[in-house]
A protein has these predicted regions:
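Short, polar/acidic, helix-capping and beta-turn segments at strand->helix junctions
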Residues: 1-125
Length: 125
């Protein structure tokens, strides 16, 4: 089965040894993704929108898009940001309504990140 890996050019991908996304057959797995500068200065909503844009770009490289997402896992530093995070998630995924989990964590990388998202997508050719 064909395996395709995608890099987003984020230096930590090489440092840590991972791909932004991997497609195997009809399945696409996108690694945990945070906002990047200059969006790290924004609030949780702005950071989530920026992270989802990076996810969307990775999906497009393997012939998918946000409509193909079937599961999201969102990691948040502060659950007080849930309304902002949910707004960004709803605006981005309302049409496909993926299964979703929200997890509070102590810290993310980079340290100024407030939220991170990882997704699984299924592409029906």
């Amino acid at each position: 089965m064909l395996r395709t890996t995608i890099s987003s050019g984020y230096p930590f991908e090489d440092t840590y040894g991972y791909a932004r996304a991997v497609r195997v057959g009809q399945y696409v797995f996108v690694s945990g993704t945070t906002a990047r500068a200059p969006h790290l200065e924004g609030n949780a909503y702005e950071q989530m929108i920026a992270a989802i844009a990076t996810v969307g770009a990775a999906l497009r490289e393997v012939g998918a898009d946000l409509r193909h997402v079937v599961r999201t896992v969102v990691y948040a530093i502060d659950l007080a940001d849930t309304v902002q995070i949910a707004r960004a998630h709803r605006e981005s995924f309302n049409a496909s309504r993926p299964a979703s989990t929200l997890v509070q964590v102590v810290a993310l990388t980079p340290a100024s990140a407030l939220v991170e998202i990882e997704v699984t997508a299924i592409v029906h050719d």
